[in-house]
């Protein structure tokens, strides 16, 4: 029986058999100007996973009030941390790009293509997923860069990935990496960063562990984020053998009038200063890369508040970023979730130039219910 010939209008498919690894972070605006900020905020705040408010009511609030007031204020905040002489502009974009390059270097394989994307802003998840498929990836591991799971972070990344696949005739196999809030490598990396800070800045009177907050109603509805954050904090305190009385897990970045997870970071730090704490060290383990919420909200705004209320020394402990310890965490999680798809070396011995070739995209021209811990 003869084989039916390929139709003349049959689409061309690139060589299959490659594996894609996509690191995904929250996102960043293209610039600090008002139009860029408005575009970014509109996309971010229109996400049903982020804002769980009746759509019509929220549309009126967002378009009638927030997008007419917030862009300029947010732009001013971004301007304070913007990398003006760097083509990436955004610290988050630069660090995420470097993380992808480091992973490509360490896990380099002829069958693995590593890239990065942003849930909001550029490069988008859908464009990067398509790029990986076009490059021959028949299986793709998506790694949301959130150690603790929340519907408003991890779930919305997964939503966007599968939205891309929804209309595909030929879908690749897709895996999504789970959270790693209690992974030993992650906890050790956090503990080591605290130890380094103590060695450099001295022993603080209090150590504050600040996580991004979510509305309390999300937790009540079943989101495991609060439990996972507290477990991370508990494991970190145990690893450090830190005095409970001077170890504080808090939540930052609340938005609007609805109650969020507590205690609030800003109020907690001010209270510490008012009660006689002279030296506070603070870290934000829920962020794998420094960004607006850490560089500005913590290290600038909260730093100033602490000093204004009687504090003397404020030690901000940077995120793990693309440090050797930070990369060890990301590489370990990626390796575990690539099992069966790609054989990866234990150590990367490839030169940086080769790593850059393995990264599908270089820098742009411009510009989170589980058991309680």
Predicted regions mapped to residue ranges:
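Active-site-proximal alpha-helix that buttresses catalytic centers in soluble enzyme cores
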Residues: 2-352
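Intrinsically disordered, polybasic Lys/Arg-rich low-complexity tracts
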Residues: 347-373
